């Protein structure tokens, strides 16, 4: 119970910095040079990239609003892998935990003028105890295109949102997690890692995202 209260408290503390992270990410993009080998398909009318000198709060609201109101794609999410870090768990626990997160989700997304990814999503999947766990939120990824094939992309960023779990009585819990991806054309393999302590947390979770 103490651990749960601690995690909830930490989540509540970290959630307010999410808009700052979004603003910081956009600021980095605005001051960095373009390294792509060829143009990418982005939203040329993206209002977020056109506005300078905005507050971090306004920039964050614009990012969310643009993603919601002017998405470039609608996405299907398919949870694929849950893996409990064997170096941080007793075998008796991992033997009985579920690692097949059956479920599905839906979202909208866009690429900004820098070719970086913004998305809003909601998913539901079977958790470690084989109970339904919903999660929804916002994701941002800085995108790199290391080859001449611009459809092949690598991403690194964060996701912020809210989840609810059966073993926490489905109390809404804010989350702030790292996000990474490998993408080709309309298909992305995205993943996050949930940090924790011994026998708690330390879970790798990944899903497929298909643009429709």
Curated annotation (Swiss-Prot):
Residues 36-56 are annotated as: Disordered. Residues 1-24 form the signal peptide. The keyword Membrane applies. It catalyses: a lipid A + a 1,2-diacyl-sn-glycero-3-phosphocholine = a hepta-acyl lipid A + a 2-acyl-sn-glycero-3-phosphocholine; a lipid IVA + a 1,2-diacyl-sn-glycero-3-phosphocholine = a lipid IVB + a 2-acyl-sn-glycero-3-phosphocholine; a lipid IIA + a 1,2-diacyl-sn-glycero-3-phosphocholine = a lipid IIB + a 2-acyl-sn-glycero-3-phosphocholine. It is found in: Cell outer membrane. One of its GO terms (biological process) is lipid A biosynthetic process. Transfers a fatty acid residue from the sn-1 position of a phospholipid to the N-linked hydroxyfatty acid chain on the proximal unit of lipid A or its precursors. The active site is at residues 84, 127-128. Its main location: membrane. The keyword Ubl conjugation does not apply. The gene is pagP. GO terms for cellular component: cell outer membrane. This is Lipid A acyltransferase PagP. Homodimer. Its EC number is 2.3.1.251. GO terms for molecular function: acyltransferase activity. Keywords: Acyltransferase, Cell outer membrane, Membrane, Signal, Transferase. Gene3D superfamilies: 2.40.160.20.
């Amino acid at each position: 119970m103490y651990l749960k209260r601690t995690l909830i408290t930490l989540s509540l503390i970290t959630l307010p910095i999410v808009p700052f992270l979004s603003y910081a990410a956009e600021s980095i993009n605005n001051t960095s040079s373009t390294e792509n080998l060829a143009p990418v398909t982005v939203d040329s009318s993206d209002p977020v990239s056109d506005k300078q000198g905005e507050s971090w709060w306004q920039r964050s609201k614009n990012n969310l609003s643009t993603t919601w109101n002017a998405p470039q794609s609608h996405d299907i999410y398919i949870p694929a892998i849950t893996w409990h870090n064997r170096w941080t768990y007793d075998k008796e626990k991992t033997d009985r935990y579920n690692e097949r997160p059956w479920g599905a989700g839906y979202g909208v997304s866009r690429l900004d003028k820098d070719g970086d990814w913004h998305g809003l999503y909601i998913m539901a999947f079977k958790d470690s105890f084989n109970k339904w766990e919903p999660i929804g939120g916002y994701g941002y990824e800085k995108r790199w295109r290391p080859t001449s094939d611009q459809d092949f992309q690598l991403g690194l960023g964060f996701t912020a949102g809210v989840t609810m779990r059966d073993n926490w009585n489905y109390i809404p819990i804010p989350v702030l997690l790292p996000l990474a991806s490998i993408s080709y054309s309309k298909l992305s393999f995205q993943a996050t890692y949930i940090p924790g302590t011994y026998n708690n947390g330390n879970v790798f979770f990944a899903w497929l995202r298909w643009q429709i």
